[in-house]
Design a protein with these regions (language model features):
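Transmembrane beta-strands of outer-membrane beta-barrel pores
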Residues: 33-37, 60-66, 85-89, 105-109, ...
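Bacterial Sec-dependent N-terminal signal peptides
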Residues: 1-25
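Solvent-exposed loop/turn segments connecting transmembrane beta-strands
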Residues: 31-43, 66-75, 102-113, 141-150
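Short loop/turn motifs that connect adjacent beta-strands in outer-membrane beta-barrel proteins
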Residues: 19-26, 52-53, 88-99, 122-123
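Short glycine/proline- and aromatic-enriched beta-strand/turn motifs that initiate or cap beta-hairpins
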Residues: 16-56, 160
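Membrane-embedded beta-strand positions of outer-membrane beta-barrel proteins
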Residues: 29-33, 58-60, 81-83, 101-103, ...
Length: 161
């Protein structure tokens, strides 16, 4: 029983110290899995705080599991610039949780995303993110052009740098 109480107190201390977004100068790196129709892959983001509740960054994806044959590197790779509104503290969430809606501009489209981060410690947490295209550069996409140009779901690990 003594060990359980000690472990609980240690976890509480770590959770109380963790901060999901601290504002200007805050740097986050995320890596995880990306899921979309007919493909799965790996993704990574880097976000840099430019204000109390704003960050800018980059997002990249490479699809590893594409259904069917015939896709090439250009179909499977994507790169985006992104802007986030980090609103966890605005809506009254604990400091180790952040919610961030945002906009992104990529190689295939202009889109929006909604994500959330939960930090267990000051340096490590988990995240999940949904993204949708708002305006596609090609009005009629088909076949492999649909990859990285549709609704996506990502989840993985988040790190404070």
């Amino acid at each position: 029983m003594k060990k359980i109480i000690t472990l609980g107190l240690l976890l509480t201390a770590f959770l109380g110290n963790a901060q999901a977004f601290t504002g200007k100068g805050d740097d986050k790196f995320q890596v995880g899995a990306n899921f979309q129709e007919n493909a799965t892959g790996i993704m990574a983001t880097y976000d840099h705080g430019i204000g109390e509740n704003m960050s800018i960054g980059i997002y990249t994806t490479y699809l590893l599991g594409v259904d069917g044959d015939g896709s090439d590197f250009a179909d499977e790779f994507d790169l985006k610039a992104r802007f986030n509104a980090n609103i966890g503290n605005v809506i009254g969430l604990p400091e180790n949780i952040d919610v961030y809606p945002g906009l992104n501009l990529g190689l295939r489209n202009f889109g929006a995303h909604l994500g959330g981060r939960y930090f267990f410690t000051n340096g490590f947490g988990v995240f999940t993110e949904l993204a949708v295209p708002i305006a596609k550069y090609e009005s009629h996409v088909f076949g492999y052009e649909h990859l990285n140009n549709q609704f996506t779901f990502s989840l993985g690990a988040s790190f404070n740098l």
